[in-house]
Amino acid sequence: MRALLLFCFVASLLLSGQAEETEDVSEEVPMRDRSHIEKTLMLNEDKPTDDFSAVLQRLRKIYHSSIKPLEQSYKYNELRQHEITDGEITSKPMVLFLGPWSVGKSTMINYLLGLENTRYQLYTGAEPTTSEFTVLMHGPKLKTIEGIVMAADSARSFSPLEKFGQNFLEKLIGIEVPHKLLERVTFVDTPGIIENRKQQERGYPFNDVCQWFIDRADLIFVVFDPTKLDVGLELETLFRQLKGRESQIRIILNKADNLATQMLMRVYGALFWSLAPLINVTEPPRVYVSSFWPQEYKPDTHRELFLREEISLLEDLNQVIENRLENKIAFIRQHAIRVRIHALLVDRYLQTYKDKMTFFSDGELVFKDIVEDPDKFYIFKTILAKTNVSKFDLPNREAYKDFFGINPISSFKLLSQQCSYMGGCFLEKIERAITQELPSLLGSLGLGKNPGALNCDKTGCGETPKNRYKKH
């Protein structure tokens, strides 16, 4: 009995000694210096956050007075499914994190914000840990906001997400964190892609939700783990959704210090080989190779290369932040160009329909013939002859079959009839916004002018539209 007690005592001492040794080892894990993050993103500067409210208010006014009337009149939202809200106009740049499960998306966000070992940090792990779309925003104190509340708040840019249903809103969460970087940018963490899970099992249209965030993101980080480079159906679908957004995409090969040099080169080549069929552009997106977490790089790895890659990524992020207003104005102008072209096309369809109709004609058959073969009636060629219309901006012809299937042609008016005595003409207002008002607002940023003091004699400013019925 005495021998048994002695054995138990010695065993407990050994186990406690091992536990203390393990604890000491865990405490001795070297952490990486973060000074390059603060320096590159200018987080240590004490200057107050720039106040862009005057420019954004001016931009919002141009949109509502010069663009939205034509957009609503010709139901552009039903063609592109992209409705611009006031919250979207005034929102901060959005950085979207996409990729397979457990590749380090949440860990990367924690690292960039310095949230490790704080009560603010996102939960991370080797298993799929993120099942929600998590939006990290700035706030005076730590606060969690339910998705249903975010969608109901018209001041935020997330109110259109309500259309994806209550099941999705339960998977949407907002977190306000008092962090200086979040004063200038918003991070969005997404559920990892799991190839063996059917989309229907998520309970909401996952791909449609991803497309909504992709369309509004200023920078898109697609993160990969070098040990998991398999490209399945969901990842293929994701890259199809990213078509046309190649300039915003940055591909990240994370956890790079886990591999030896030769293996890292093989993985780098394998990544390009896997993605080549999915990214059909002349200039591929930039690929960053590093390890985005707070622990020191593993020994005998390319530390200098990884650090330079990380700084390059931070410079990319800072560039998006610095060009926030320029990008926002350019986005609204591009939207206005698309709305104008859509209105011209609908007007041309309507004019052709009226020209072909006779007293004995069947209106439904006449218009069906026009929609089925618009080239026969020179619909798109006529629009290309207009001023400032590029063939690369023309929508797909097939899209108008669906559009007019929902919206009868009789529900629209000709552009020549979209004029009022006091308000002027919708087409003239949007053209003035595209050619004068928005470029002038953009130019005022470089000159440091007050946007409220622009020369309204030159730009029109959307305040007093020309009265085309006034006698001279």
UniProtKB/Swiss-Prot annotation:
Sorted UniProt keywords: Glycoprotein, Membrane, Sarcoplasmic reticulum, Signal
Record region (G2 motif): 127-128
Post-translational modifications: N-glycosylated.
Annotated spans, G4 motif: 254-257
Record-linked CDD domains: EHD (cd09913)
Alphabetical list of SUPFAM superfamilies matching this protein: P-loop containing nucleoside triphosphate hydrolases (SSF52540)
GO MF, one example: calcium ion binding
Tissue specificity as recorded in UniProt: Detected in skeletal muscle.
Region named G3 motif: 189-192
Topology versus the membrane: Peripheral membrane protein
Record-annotated Dynamin-type G domain positions: 89-330
Localisation: Sarcoplasmic reticulum lumen; Sarcoplasmic reticulum membrane
Region annotation (G5 motif) ranges: 277
Annotated segments matching region G1 motif: 99-106
Signal peptide range in chain numbering: 1-19
Family as reported in the entry's similarity comment: Belongs to the TRAFAC class dynamin-like GTPase superfamily. Dynamin/Fzo/YdjA family.
Protein name: Sarcalumenin
GN (gene name): SRL
InterPro entries assigned to the protein according to its UniProt record, in alphabetical order: Dynamin_N, EHD_N, G_DYNAMIN_dom, P-loop_NTPase, TRAFAC_Dynamin-like_GTPase
Family annotation (PANTHER family): SARCALUMENIN (PTHR43681:SF1), TRANSMEMBRANE GTPASE FZO (PTHR43681)
GO terms (BP aspect): response to muscle activity involved in regulation of muscle adaptation; store-operated calcium entry
Glycosylation sites: 280, 388
GO (cellular component) term, any one: sarcoplasmic reticulum
